[in-house]
Design a protein with these regions (language model features):
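Hydrophobic alpha-helical segments and their helix-loop junctions in multi-pass secondary transporters
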Residues: 131-135, 187-220, 235, 242, ...
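Transmembrane alpha-helical segments of multi-pass small-molecule transport proteins
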Residues: 39, 140-172, 186-195, 231-250, ...
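Juxtamembrane transmembrane-helix boundary signature
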Residues: 2, 69-103, 112-127, 288, ...
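C-terminal membrane-solvent junction of multi-pass transporters and transport-like membrane proteins
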Residues: 392-465, 469-471
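Membrane-interface loop-to-helix entry segments
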Residues: 157, 161-202, 208-212, 267-270, ...
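Hydrophobic transmembrane alpha-helices that form the core helical bundles
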Residues: 108-146, 325-345
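Membrane-interface "cap" regions at the ends of multi-pass membrane proteins
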Residues: 1-64, 221-235, 254-262, 465-471
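Membrane-water interface regions at transmembrane-helix termini and the short interhelical loops
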Residues: 57-59, 86, 102, 110, ...
Length: 471
């Protein structure tokens, strides 16, 4: 055994095999095959059963949906490949440890707390999705689009049991999360495809024009929803995972990649999940909207419920129930794993398994409240807007620190616990564009990229100014 191998084994043992506070060693790097299942599984998953129908409630047209998703998902793949994966293989650090080097311990603690909690809310929405399938044999009342609170004891019991299983899987670490996705994702992808085909038959589609006319020129949004245009679809689908790519959260995943080109595997998630699966789920909801139950809601001026379990069950029976359960798991598993890493940075004395169980418990509590799933379009937009600008700090420092003449990883080198350059860059960009969104009723996803750019530029400017003062 070489000294290099001995050192790698020592690192792995001290880190519990997750390498939270050191670069991933060469012997632990993984090929593209280890990532494609995770991304296909995570993005052809529980969120898709919610997002597809929610596009219909927003009154999208056929062109807006089909072409808008094509472009928006391409922008997401390019962001992962040329930003996230590129930086990840250079540094091989988690997002949280990388930010600590730049921001300082105190500042990054606040970020990690917000990041972990938001991840838990997202995972909770996926537990909600799985619960709508598990509850079918028990004749459980399904949550409505406007529901916020648990609707009964059966709902609570099912959510708690699902949350416990998901948390245990996530707590076993990246290897288990990746393997779970590898096993589940082919089944889920096949289920989405089958649901789409069956729904087309139920809708009487026999030609492309029939398919196009399902959405046609669009419609008025359902009560309580906003109208989605072409640009809403493009920008929202680009930043649906903004915290993961331009926000750099997936540094924690791609640090295990052998090469940056592994970032291209995210296309499996975007075009199998955020394209085929969203459209298939929208077709399931289109079938439901023709039912007497849905028509009764619409006649009363109310939005029909979006319950993935019954919709999939109506299309492909028990196979649909199983698919929805597994789809929720494959999104919640890696999301809880990421949340655990965020909490690990705040509570470094706790093992990865313990903080992941903590994250899973919070996600389970969130899953009890259907609002996180029913308002998923709005929540995902807010989530990306809050977290993405922090990724700009990493990106702009990585690519422009030499041109800007600033010191890389300044908090680490200057032994700062609070880098005010980062704080003011984020606070100004967040405050300015959130004000614009609220004051002028601008869709939040529209201002995410401008806020990201401004945060990166301000970080370079403030770093140049403050570092010069210190020197």
């Amino acid at each position: 055994m070489t000294q290099y191998s001995i050192n790698e084994d020592a690192i792995a043992e001290s880190s519990g095999g997750e390498f939270e506070r050191e670069p991933v060693p060469q012997s632990k790097l993984k090929s593209w095959k280890c990532f494609i299942g995770m991304y296909a599984g995570e993005h052809a998953a529980g969120t898709e059963f919610m997002i597809g129908p929610l596009f219909l409630t927003a009154g999208v047209s056929a062109f807006d949906l089909i072409v808008g998703l094509l472009i928006g998902n391409l922008l997401a793949v390019l962001s992962w490949r040329f930003l996230t994966a590129e930086i990840a293989v250079k540094n091989r650090l988690t997002l949280y440890f990388q930010l600590e080097k730049i921001c300082g311990k105190k500042l990054v603690t606040g970020y990690n707390l917000a990041n972990g909690i938001l991840f838990c809310f997202l995972a909770g929405a996926m537990i909600t999705v799985s619960a709508t399938a598990v509850g079918i044999p028990f004749d459980m009342p399904m949550p409505k689009l406007t529901d916020t609170m648990p609707n009964g004891a059966t709902w609570i019991i099912i959510v708690v049991l699902i949350g416990a299983v998901i948390s245990i899987i996530a707590a076993r670490g990246y290897e288990t999360v990746s393997k779970a996705a590898d096993w589940m994702s082919p089944f889920i992808v096949l289920a989405f495809l089958a649901c789409g085909i069956v729904a087309l038959s139920q809708l009487g589609v026999t030609s492309f024009s029939d398919f196009w006319n399902i959405w046609g020129e669009g419609s008025d949004p359902f009560p309580g929803q906003i109208k989605f245009t072409f640009w809403h679809v493009v920008i929202w689908s680009w930043f649906a995972n903004g915290a993961m790519h331009v926000g750099m959260s997936d540094l924690s995943v791609f640090r295990f990649a052998k090469r940056a080109r592994v970032g291209w595997v995210t296309a499996a998630g975007m075009y199998v999940g955020h394209y085929m699966a969203w459209i298939a789920a929208a077709l399931l909801y289109a079938v439901y909207l023709k039912s007497p139950e849905a028509q009764a809601f619409l006649s009363l001026g109310e939005a029909p419920p979006v319950a993935p379990g019954p919709m999939a069950h109506n299309a492909i029976g028990v196979f649909g129930i199983i698919a929805v359960v597994l789809a929720g798991w494959t999104t919640a598993n890696p999301t809880i794993y990421r949340a655990g890493l965020a909490f690990q940075a705040i509570l470094p004395k706790l093992s990865t398994a313990k903080v992941t169980i903590l994250a899973g418990s919070l996600a389970t509590i969130a899953g009890l409240f259907p609002a996180f799933a029913m308002k998923l379009l709005d929540f995902v937009a807010l989530y990306g807007f809050i977290l993405a600008p922090f990724g700009a700090v990493i990106v702009f420092e990585h690519f422009f620190h030499k041109k800007a003449g600033i010191i890389k990883n300044y908090a680490e080198s200057a032994k700062l616990s609070f880098n005010k350059s980062v704080f003011w860059a984020w606070a100004i960009s967040f405050g300015l564009f959130y004000f614009i969104s609220v004051q002028f009723d601008v869709f939040l996803s529209f201002v995410t990229f401008p806020a990201w750019i401004l945060c990166g530029v301000l970080f370079l400017v403030f770093s140049k100014l403050f570092q010069k003062q210190v020197q």
